[in-house]
Amino acid sequence: MIRFVRKIQTSPLFPSIVALLCAGAVAQAELAPDVKPALAKDGFDEEQMRLAKAIHKRILDYQAIKKKTNNGKAEKLIAFQDPLASGAKLDMLPVKGGEFTWRGEKEDDILEVSLSPFWMSKHEITWEAYEPFMLSPIPRQKDGQPLDFMRAQIQNDIEFIARPTPPYHPMTFGMKRDGHPALSMTQHAANKYCQWVSFQTGHFYRLPTEAEWEFACRAGSDTDYSWGTDAQKAGDYAWFGGGASTHYNVPGQKKPNALGFYDMHGNVLEWTLDQYVPNRKEYFGKDKVHNPWVKATKPYPHVTKGGHWQQSLQEISAAARHQSTPIWKVADPQRPRSLWYHTTTPWLGLRIVRPAKIPTVEEMYHYWNSGVEADE
């Protein structure tokens, strides 16, 4: 069993892009300073909790309508498409949940994990699905909130969801865009994207936990790769360094795993919700866990999974764990650095999940607001 963890360093292949990013950042006009969020007595950001409540109600109302039109029957755990306002669609596949043995980097780090049912996006999120979120139609503060003079003019709550400020340079790093995975967002940006998609669709979305991601990747297998142990088959399923990839690729060109998910190995790294801890069994303090999630307590490191197009076969295994690091923002001259972009990661993306059970308002709030992003 391969157990691999790595702090990924800045790619040496893009020095000119890094220089452009720095130059563009210096030239960019200064945005309005951030306003410290108002915290309620329970510690929640008042504006973000208001939004969470509004989206939670929207989701419950939509589910009630769907149930009524389905003669009172509950929604089935089957594949479906979720259209976005931009015209892009999310292809979602069911994962019935279940149990698996979760092995860590250390010999004694073995957990028996059970997971509730969920849906996961069939492919990595593409630019077509992500860019309308990234390119906000209204001016924003560095924290992604609308500028004060705009707030009274906003008619739709979706514009109160924090969204990225303009990027310094096209985040494709000189590679192709159409049909390709969205790149270089921070975990905070990925969380806010999930909130934005939830508002649009009436379905609750979030990043997968590390356990959910690995369970979906393994697709019932207990080997390092979803296709088995034959290294000669790797090129049929994955874009990776050993396959001579020189750039990221349009998702869905390789073979899927047994559950129908594409590019779980290679192409781009994918965000999870979890803070990185070296020993998960030690963290949870027990042998069996249900729906495990290591909630963030600091900006770094978080866990990314799947490996990317530059990495070795070992680094794209189902068990491999990769840690986010401040080095990913080394080309950002802002102080504090951007909440939204990693300026040196032309191999970092995301896919998203929809749990079968709708969470509470408080749970939604915590999934979308890690509470540590301001320190990045």
Segment roles from a protein language model:
Residues 31-82, 87:
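Primarily auto-inhibitory N-terminal propeptides
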Residues 86-101:
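Mature N-terminal segment immediately following signal peptide/propeptide cleavage
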Residues 83, 110, 250-253, 340-343:
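Short Gly/Pro-enriched turn/cap motifs at secondary-structure boundaries
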Residues 1-10:
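N-terminal secretory signal peptides that target proteins for export/translocation
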Residues 101, 167-327:
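Functional-site microenvironments in short loops/helix caps that host divalent-cation chemistry
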Residues 30-54, 114-227, 273-279, 354-376:
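Active-site microenvironments of metalloenzymes and redox enzymes
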Residues 31-40, 255-257, 290-376:
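Disulfide-stabilized, aromatic/cysteine-rich ligand-recognition loop
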Residues 15-24:
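Bacterial N-terminal signal peptides
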